[in-house]
């Protein structure tokens, strides 16, 4: 039986850093989440990745493994925004909703990536919902 990254990461050595422990826990949560959800062509998966500085989001069709649309806080129109990271997350949520509409998608499956639903993740999700995505 092949071991996944989450399985091997679950066996943490004594004295592991707090950030490493949090990363391992997030990977385990994401692995559990991914067992239950998958994106299709009509209803792709809205995948969120959050770093300390940026947030990235993709619409993924898991049936053929393609990315339908993507948005990120690294893009020039988002980088120029005044405000905090949450304001940038709201703008990224608006962008992904616009790009999903342009691709003919109105319903998605939300994959929070193992992150807790709050702060920047919730702000992105709420902005995407307000701009027409259903999930």
Curated annotation (Swiss-Prot):
A GO CC term assigned to this protein in UniProt: cytosolic large ribosomal subunit
An example Gene Ontology biological process: translation
Record flagged with keyword Ribosomal protein: yes
Assigned keywords, A-Z: Ribonucleoprotein, Ribosomal protein, RNA-binding, rRNA-binding
Location of the region described as Disordered in the Swiss-Prot/TrEMBL record: 1-23
Pfam families in UniProt: Ribosomal_L18p (PF00861)
Listed InterPro entries: Ribosomal_uL18_bac-type, Ribosomal_uL18_bac/euk
GO MF annotations in UniProt: 5S rRNA binding; structural constituent of ribosome
Listed Gene3D superfamilies: 3.30.420.100
Functional summary from the UniProt entry: This is one of the proteins that bind and probably mediate the attachment of the 5S RNA into the large ribosomal subunit, where it forms part of the central protuberance.
Assembly: Part of the 50S ribosomal subunit; part of the 5S rRNA/L5/L18/L25 subcomplex. Contacts the 5S and 23S rRNAs.
Family: Belongs to the universal ribosomal protein uL18 family.
Name of the molecule in the record: Large ribosomal subunit protein uL18
Gene: rplR
């Amino acid at each position: 039986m092949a071991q996944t990254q989450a399985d091997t990461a679950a066996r943490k050595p004594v004295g592991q850093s707090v950030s490493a422990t949090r990363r391992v826990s997030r990977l385990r949560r994401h692995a559990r989440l991914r067992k239950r959800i998958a994106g299709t062509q009509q209803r792709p998966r809205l995948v969120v990745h959050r770093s300390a500085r940026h947030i990235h989001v993709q619409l993924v069709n898991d049936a053929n493994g393609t990315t339908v649309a993507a948005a990120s806080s690294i893009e020039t129109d988002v980088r120029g925004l005044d405000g905090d990271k949450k304001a940038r997350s709201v703008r990224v949520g608006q962008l992904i909703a616009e790009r999903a509409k342009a691709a003919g998608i109105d319903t998605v499956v939300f994959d929070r990536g193992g992150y807790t639903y709050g702060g920047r993740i919730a702000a992105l999700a709420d902005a995407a919902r307000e701009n027409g995505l259903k999930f």
